[in-house]
């Protein structure tokens, strides 16, 4: 019984807003970008968007007032940290000198480390086939084509 309670506490501990925030801020610190703060307002927006996707869990961006990363995990448990790690793992695909993504696949990472986005709100919901749908929104919006996410002198 004690093992079950410990595992339940561990699962719960890996599914808090702080998990989203800590991993975002770690990725930002690696390139000398200041930390983000959790925003309940932005988190409410993320939750409302998830509710719209509840029926299909389609990987479609909200086109709302914030920057956005979305993903889904197909595990019995897909923790908040897992989603953020997927995005952070795109870092090697970003060439800061040329401001290019290898294969065009680093936009989640650049959204995470964008210097002007300072507020974060995220949400997660279960979907079909044991998947989890995760959305994080960034305020103010960013990730503009042709602009670098952070200054070159910081790397």
Where is each model-derived feature located?
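Disulfide-stabilized extracellular recognition modules
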Residues: 66, 74-155
């Amino acid at each position: 019984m004690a093992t079950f309670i410990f595992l339940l506490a561990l699962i719960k501990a890996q599914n808090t807003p702080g998990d989203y925030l800590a991993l975002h801020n770690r990725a930002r610190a690696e390139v000398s970008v200041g930390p983000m703060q959790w925003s309940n307002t932005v988190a409410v927006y993320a939750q409302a968007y998830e509710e719209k996707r509840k029926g299909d869990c389609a990987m479609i961006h909200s086109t709302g007032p914030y920057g956005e990363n979305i993903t889904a995990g197909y595990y019995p448990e897909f923790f908040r940290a897992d989603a953020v790690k997927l995005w952070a793992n795109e870092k090697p695909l970003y060439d800061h000198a040329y401001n290019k993504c290898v294969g065009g696949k680093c936009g989640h990472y650049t959204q995470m480390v964008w210097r002007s986005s300072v507020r974060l709100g995220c949400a997660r919901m279960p979907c079909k086939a044991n998947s989890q749908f995760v959305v994080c929104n960034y305020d103010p919006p960013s990730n503009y084509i042709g602009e670098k996410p952070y200054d070159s002198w910081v790397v």
